Curated annotation (Swiss-Prot):
Keywords: Arginine metabolism, Hydrolase. Catalyzes the hydrolysis of N(2)-succinylarginine into N(2)-succinylornithine, ammonia and CO(2). It holds the Pfam family AstB. PANTHER family: N-SUCCINYLARGININE DIHYDROLASE. The gene is astB. It comes from the Bacteria. This is N-succinylarginine dihydrolase. Homodimer. Pathway: Amino-acid degradation; L-arginine degradation via AST pathway; L-glutamate and succinate from L-arginine: step 2/5. One of its GO terms (molecular function) is N-succinylarginine dihydrolase activity. It catalyses: N(2)-succinyl-L-arginine + 2 H2O + 2 H(+) = N(2)-succinyl-L-ornithine + 2 NH4(+) + CO2. The lineage of its organism: Bacteria, Pseudomonadati, Pseudomonadota, Betaproteobacteria, Burkholderiales. GO terms for biological process: arginine catabolic process to glutamate; arginine catabolic process to succinate. Its EC number is 3.5.3.23.
Length: 446
């Protein structure tokens, strides 16, 4: 059956700020306490969505989550009226207010792991929201993620949106940022590729400086839950040294799609064996596997992390060629820029590079790949998606006007203590659910 890959980008929320919450994420740490521009951040992301939609790629949008999360603050023991709660948290535990106010749900690569209907045991598209247990500000996302996905993918005969895995370090799950899929064509059965940083129960190498956020046990549980065949599933461990260098998710060191894996030379433990297993399993499904491996001598891990070369989108055009979508920072690093020029001029499957300014997201450690959740859909499944979330000229204009109306153009850490920010955010989100036609998604609407 004919199918295509759709990308659902997270719309940056009104409380976008820099609080340095993500240990192991170099950009997040380096920009702690910087001044953010939520309006610019949201418009940069929206422009990327629109340009890719204009090029013919299927492009949807995921709404922001409600922030600050009053539910979290009340669960942590702060009682009283909302303005009073925010005032007391800001005074006594500002780090908790920062966590409750984070707009990190914009990075929808961490929203869930998705398996298309061609791969699953029951012929439905399966979603497992990521529990994101490694960080407080992200561990509060999965309930809202599940609610949003169930509103967007509501037909139970075609879609299954599971609960997140249990929230324990043994099952730490970071979603699609550590997952990709290879296939001969989107509508055919493919090979699903899960990458983990450590195992809870198996002995093996682990990073020493920064935590490994994804466990083997979580990856395997998601594969089992989705009903994936063992002979079409591959697990690989991310190299501990690259995690210690700031590669906190696999999508900072590798990206794959269809028949191609684009990765750094040092991405995986026992890298050749990983390639061999992917090649053999894909060949059994009549697919040819191509690897574009970037030598460390040409682009170092440090360059990969600072430029986010691999936190790119690898998109398949209708003619079978592939396009790499990279952040502007790749052109500002001379070694990475030289490599990309060489790649585009070669006969590799990737023969075009698109560059986007996503500076506001990048300063928090999120490039093009972080901002999108990939969902392979056949024609009937695509028709069953909530119709108001697909980017076109009309929706782009409405969202651009909505951002202009509701978002601040400056947000400092101290501004999180302003109770008016909560009301501004709720007013914006209430209007957004009407624009997207998603009903009452948020706690304050219920």
């Amino acid at each position: 059956m004919q199918a295509t890959e759709a990308n659902f980008d997270g719309l940056v929320g009104p409380t976008h700020n820099y609080a340095g919450l993500s240990f192991g994420n170099v950009a997040s740490q380096n920009n702690d306490k910087s001044i953010a521009n939520p309006k610019m951040a949201a418009k940069q992301g929206l422009r990327k969505m629109k340009q890719l939609a204009d090029l013919g790629f299927k492009q949807g949008v995921l709404p922001p989550q409600e922030r600050p999360s009053m539910r979290l603050l009340r669960e942590l023991g702060f009682a009283g009226d909302e303005a009073g709660v925010i005032e007391r948290v800001a005074k006594n535990a500002p780090e908790l207010l920062a966590a409750a106010s984070s707009a990190s749900a914009m990075w929808t690569a961490n929203a869930a792991t998705v398996s298309p209907s061609a791969d699953t045991h029951d012929g439905r598209v399966h979603f497992t929201p990521a529990n994101l247990t490694s960080k407080l500000h992200r561990a509060i996302e999965h309930e809202s993620t599940r609610r949003t996905l169930r509103a967007m993918f509501a037909d139970p005969s075609r879609f299954v949106v599971h609960e997140a895995l249990p929230g324990t370090p043994a099952l730490g799950d970071e979603g699609a940022a550590n997952h990709t899929r290879f296939c001969a064509e989107y509508g055919a059965k493919g090979v699903e590729f899960f990458v983990y940083g450590r195992s809870e129960y198996r002995r093996g190498p682990e990073p020493k400086r920064f935590p490994a956020r994804q466990t083997f046990e979580a990856s395997r549980a998601v594969a089992h839950r989705h009903g994936l065949a063992d002979d079409a599933t591959v697990y690989a461990q991310q190299t501990p040294d690259v995690i210690d260098a700031g590669v906190f998710h696999n999508d900072v060191i590798a990206v794959g799609n269809a028949r191609t894996l684009f990765c750094h030379q040092l991405a995986f433990v026992d890298q050749k064996s990983v390639y061999d297993e992917l090649r053999v399993k894909l060949a059994k499904l009549n697919g040819e596997f191509n690897v574009i491996e970037v030598p460390d001598a040409q682009v170092s891990v440090a360059d990969a992390v600072s430029s986010y070369l691999f936190n790119s989108q690898l998109l398949l055009r209708g003619d079978g060629r592939q396009v790499l979508v990279v952040p502007q920072e790749c052109r500002e690093n001379s070694r990475v820029a030289a490599y990309l020029d060489e790649l585009a001029a070669s006969k590799a499957p990737i023969d075009d590079v698109l560059v986007f300014d996503l500076r506001e997201s990048m300063k928090n450690g999120g490039g093009p790949a972080c901002l999108r959740l990939r969902v392979v859909l056949n024609e009937a499944e695509r028709a069953a998606v909530a119709p108001g979330v697909w980017i076109d000229d009309t929706l782009f204009t409405r969202l651009d006007d909505w951002i202009e109306k509701h978002y601040r153009d400056r947000l400092a850490p101290a501004d999180l203590a302003d109770p008016k920010l909560l009301n501004e955010s709720r007013t914006a989100l209430d209007e957004l659910t009407q624009i997207l036609g998603l009903g009452s998604l948020y706690d304050f609407q219920r």
